Amino acid sequence: MNIHFIAIGGSAMHNLAIALHQKGYTISGSDDTIHDPSKSRLKKYNLLPTEFGWFPEKITNAIDVVILGMHAKKDNIELLKAQELGVKIVSYPEFLYEQSKDKTRVVIGGSHGKTTITSMILHILNYHDKEVDYMVGAQLDGFETMVHLTEENDFIVLEGDEYLSSPTDLRPKFHLYKPNIALISGIAWDHINVFPTFENYKEQFKIFTDSMINGGSMVYNSEDRNVAEIVESSENHIKKYPYETPNHFIDNGITYLETEEGDLPLEIFGKHNLQNLAGAKWICQHMGIDEDDFYEAIASFSGASKRLEKISENSETVILKDFAHSPSKVSATTKAVSEQYKNRTLIACLELHTYSSLNAEFLSEYHGALDAADKAVVFYSPHAVEIKQLEQVSKAQIANAFQRDDLLIFTNPKEFHDFLFGQDLKSTALVLMSSGNYGGLDFEKLKSLI
């Protein structure tokens, strides 16, 4: 099969390209720019385009299917050529569904935690040598790619993103998967550029629940009232399995899970991660992993990439980075670090980087998100606001949104970096939360602070 990727450089797209290349398909692709790690990984498999840009001559009748990435625009010249020739065009999730129609589809959804839960499940299955197909949104230890597709595996585990499928298919990705087994971890308003109200956003999870296969199993976080309302009121003929935060305690900076077999030390921490663990346990049981085998394997799970990831640590200081950027994630991450390192000063730094977080109307959602920190810092780039074609937000608007009088706000990368490297980190927990890079922050240099 000949497959062409329009926007091959995306995190998910390049991993799918590699997975299909490994499956023996002939792969080509284009993009106007590709950054690492996508660039070096595509190069490793000889899939990196020889030059960047869009080239309609790449689209011929010899191509069986074009996979269209969200980064491309509706007027992309390669897309227009494919439409003109009548070449089959599909979105990323549409293609994944086509590849998994005959498998048991396990889909992990939710505004937060879906990458971590998917990663936990894959870690457990890998630990016990159980082969499954998968698609996950982060690089995992022990897994070469973020996408794996075979003919023979019975299960496929899919991270169910609620963002749109492609420029020509405006359905949320997770609406296309039609799961046999599903999970919803939580609902907190996000992606306001496509879901302008919370009710509109919440409706997408109702549609997801209703899209499940008749007789399927829904695992859900019963402590999230929006999730519970949607699942428990669903008239779809599905089995419902609620979960909640398991019993645990923290001793000397280590979180212990209370089980019938004794107290189990974990490498992860935070109430949100313990909820994630409870959800992953239910899913694994549906996939044939019993409770004892789950506990044996979860003890060695250290977290998904960029999720409360330790950059550096010594006996009195820890530096962490986290992908948190939405209000609910920022709040959960800040509270988790505060509870885990109670006797240390907590410095919490947040970069406002996404479309939603830089939107003046959405900023109020961050009220109280950094309250658990001893020292709270926000960095944002006015240039990023300009690129996203949003109205500029002022420091006063940000201060008002967080409702914290001592909030430190930086808009200049050098000033923020100077502040950071000027801190005395003795007996401190420093957490850096962003989906960006703080204007080019040198994380390797940051390690030298302790």
Residue ranges and their predicted role:
Residues 254-259:
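Short polybasic amphipathic segments
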